[in-house]
Design a protein with these regions (language model features):
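Short acidic/glycine-rich loops and adjacent helix/strand connectors
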Residues: 1-130
Length: 130
């Protein structure tokens, strides 16, 4: 089964995409890397993501617009890595905007932006997300 994974972290430099082929049992899977691509964010989008992570405030509409722009960039990276649509599903957690490591007083948490249903629609395949 071919699967596509998308990753974008707090560096906000773009999307890393990997197409891999998985075989074998779920307990002992074997996998093979088929292709990987780094798709840089356009400078304007990178600036918006970094600003959001540094605490820039905005209204709900601006956050939704940013999530949609990130989703479109994720779709572009996916198409670049899997131009023939070989993957049967896509795994994507979205763009990490803020990551809080755990401390003795507070649990760790991350905040990601993604419109997963939109990504599934754009790629015409299921998207696994959190």
């Amino acid at each position: 089964m071919r699967c596509l994974g998308l990753m974008s972290g707090t560096s906000a430099d773009g999307v890393d995409a990997v197409l891999a082929d998985f075989r074998g049992s779920p307990n002992h899977p074997q996998w093979e890397l088929i292709r990987h691509v780094h798709s840089p964010y356009p400078e304007g989008l990178r600036h918006r993501v970094v600003s959001a992570g540094q605490g820039e405030t905005g209204c709900a509409e601006q956050w939704l617009d940013l999530a949609e722009a990130i989703t479109e960039a994720q779709a572009k990276a996916a198409r670049s890595c899997d131009p023939h649509g070989e993957a049967v599903l896509v795994g994507c957690h979205g763009q990490t905007v803020w990551h809080r490591p755990p401390t003795s007083q507070q649990r760790g948490a991350s905040w990601q932006l993604l419109q997963a249903p939109l990504l599934a629609q754009l790629l015409e395949r299921p998207v696994v997300h959190d």
